[in-house]
Design a protein with these regions (language model features):
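N-terminal flexible/basic segments that precede or flank functional cores
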Residues: 1-33, 93-99
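DNA major-groove recognition helix of helix-turn-helix/homeodomain DNA-binding modules
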Residues: 74-92
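The DNA-recognition helices of helix-turn-helix-type DNA-binding domains
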Residues: 59, 70, 85, 96-99
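Short basic helix-loop element that most often maps to the first helix and adjoining turn
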Residues: 7, 36-51, 55, 80
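Recognition helix of helix-turn-helix/homeodomain-like DNA-binding domains
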Residues: 54-72
């Protein structure tokens, strides 16, 4: 990076590039961490996205969006899905803290 800076290039993070505020970056990271943990729990339980969707009263496409960390999925729904797969409140908190 130093070489790029010396050559006149400006360097920074992806967050800086797209102009995210600190709290927005934190929310993105929390969402992605919960999404990753949810997918891991679902697959460990041997559930398909459709099966998890039925347990949540949702759709397969919504579960796919949850697991992709889509911005239009609420953190509430991600937490509810984690709890539905048997995650404890502590495990949910650890996923958020890992962000």
């Amino acid at each position: 990076m130093k070489a790029l800076n010396r050559a006149g290039w400006r360097t920074g993070s992806a967050d800086e590039f797209i102009g995210l505020k600190r709290e927005e970056t934190a929310l993105v990271n929390m969402r992605l961490s919960l999404a990753e943990k949810l997918r891991g729990r679902r697959t460990k339980l041997g559930l398909s996205q459709t099966e998890l969707a039925l347990r949540l009263g949702s759709s397969q496409s919504r579960v796919a969006k949850m697991e992709a960390g889509e911005v239009d999925v609420s953190l509430d729904l991600l937490v509810r899905a984690m709890l539905n797969t048997g995650a404890s409140a502590r495990e949910v908190a650890q996923a958020i803290a890992a962000a």
